[in-house]
């Protein structure tokens, strides 16, 4: 080794992460797409195997990760240390579980890899724990989540701003905008109207983020709550 040359050493650290999705690379390797407290939206290489708990990587799981910086790539390594919350209220309820898929996909497709939004991680944790704890009717929760997500990203919806996107459903949207969470959950809507309102807010998100946000799980949610 030349005089004065230094060997680069990978740096290890722990961080909290919300699982959004994962991509299988081969039998013992996946890429986990996550929202982290320290690094924002980031993807990690994670080794799996016969003893690996794939349940760790369910959408919206909140994990403590051991992260190793990869000096040769932007794709760092990670391994799970523990799940921070059991989220049994979500995992034991097919309706909540489907809603968690939708929420994770919205964040995954809206926040680009490498992006950091101040306070977004903690905001998402609160939304996840709220869904987990809800006992009464929560079939409107994804609409409430979408409107609050807009605010978390810094573009608070105004009633007049929403009209080009919501059309005939504007009165319902305004009702949500005036309501706290318990009241919003009681707004009577058909499954079709819920789906149309959610689609209109996603179009509003697309306009403000200047991107296409194709949420595939919205149709599943519509069928489940029809």
Predicted regions and their residues:
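Non-catalytic alpha-helical scaffolds and adjoining flexible linkers that form interface surfaces
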Residues: 2-30, 35-226
